Amino acid sequence: MSAYIIETLIKILILVAVFSALGGFATYIERKVLAYFQRRLGPCYVGPFGLLQVAADGIKLFTKEDIIPQGANKFIFTLAPIIAMVSAFVSMAPIPFFPNFTLFGYEIKPLISDINIGFLFFLAVGSAGIYAPILAGLASNNKYSLIGSARATIQLLSFEVVSTLTILAPLMVVGSLSLVEINHYQSGGFLDWLVFKQPLAFVLFLIASYAELNRTPFDLLEHEAEIVAGYCTEYSGLKWGMFFLAEYAHLFAFSFVISIVFFGGFNAWGFIPGGIAILIKAGFFVFLSMWVRATYPHVRPDQLMNMCWKIMLPLALLNIVLTGIVILI
């Protein structure tokens, strides 16, 4: 029992350290990608190819003054970014990032908890992060923060419904909520990937994921031209950095989950080993989010809600019905 606890604690430390570092590095990659699309250079002065820009940004965040606005609720103002970080990293617990491997004669499972309701746990804990923008907006004593938190409540709750209903169809096909079982279901090869059996579910879940992640063109929670930085307007320094890292941690988590559910996960991909294959797939979806950000303009709140409730929700329900009919036949 003690060995299991020690192993779990080590896995948690590795997960937090690795994805925190990746979150910082992803800022550099995203700025370079956006610069390429916009015919700019991007970061290029700090270190070779601008690689040390990440370190410079980190030093800036850690040394900035932590300002709490006058009239703000200090406890809730501080609690909000902690909730964002905790929900982002805890939601990764049931995600199998790689195949099992042996180290010094000991089999290592590269996930924190192999529970049979892994996907439900991922959605539930990830959606708990909605309290972060709500509390941040309410505690900041700022009108723009309050508008941002109101938008967060509407947008995240709406798309949480869509993403949950959308994923029911693939889960009906597999017959399990375990992400490990979903991965094993697609072990037969390329044609067993669920994206070919549930293409509509994949498209709907991808769009809903970007909306839940607050990625452009769905970043209504912090749209600079309308509400400054939304619920983050009054945050600075380390607290703002925690919101920032939480957003990227959610992006990585959703990228891995989409790769596992629809694209064969860590099963070997031809001559490519499974561990490398899932990194390629997840990396592609991280890049795709940056590509979408550089390509599409913002949508209006009313357009987003119309798309959610009048288009995506009926399509998700229709897909569930059709999948059930096919399974019965």
Curated annotation (Swiss-Prot):
A Pfam family assignment: NADHdh
EC number(s) per entry: 7.1.1.-
Main location: membrane
Annotated catalysed reactions: a quinone + NADH + 5 H(+)(in) = a quinol + NAD(+) + 4 H(+)(out)
Membrane topology, from the record: Multi-pass membrane protein
Biological processes per GO annotation: aerobic respiration
Location(s) in or outside the cell: Cell inner membrane
GO molecular-function terms, A-Z: NADH dehydrogenase activity; oxidoreductase activity, acting on NAD(P)H, quinone or similar compound as acceptor; quinone binding
Taxonomy, superkingdom: Bacteria
Transmembrane segments: 9-29, 42-62, 75-95, 117-137, 154-174, 188-208, 238-258, 269-291, 309-329
Quaternary context: NDH-1 is composed of 14 different subunits. Subunits NuoA, H, J, K, L, M, N constitute the membrane sector of the complex.
Function: NDH-1 shuttles electrons from NADH, via FMN and iron-sulfur (Fe-S) centers, to quinones in the respiratory chain. The immediate electron acceptor for the enzyme in this species is believed to be ubiquinone. Couples the redox reaction to proton translocation (for every two electrons transferred, four hydrogen ions are translocated across the cytoplasmic membrane), and thus conserves the redox energy in a proton gradient. This subunit may bind ubiquinone.
Name of the protein described by the UniProt record: NADH-quinone oxidoreductase subunit H
Species of origin: Helicobacter pylori (strain J99 / ATCC 700824) (Campylobacter pylori J99)
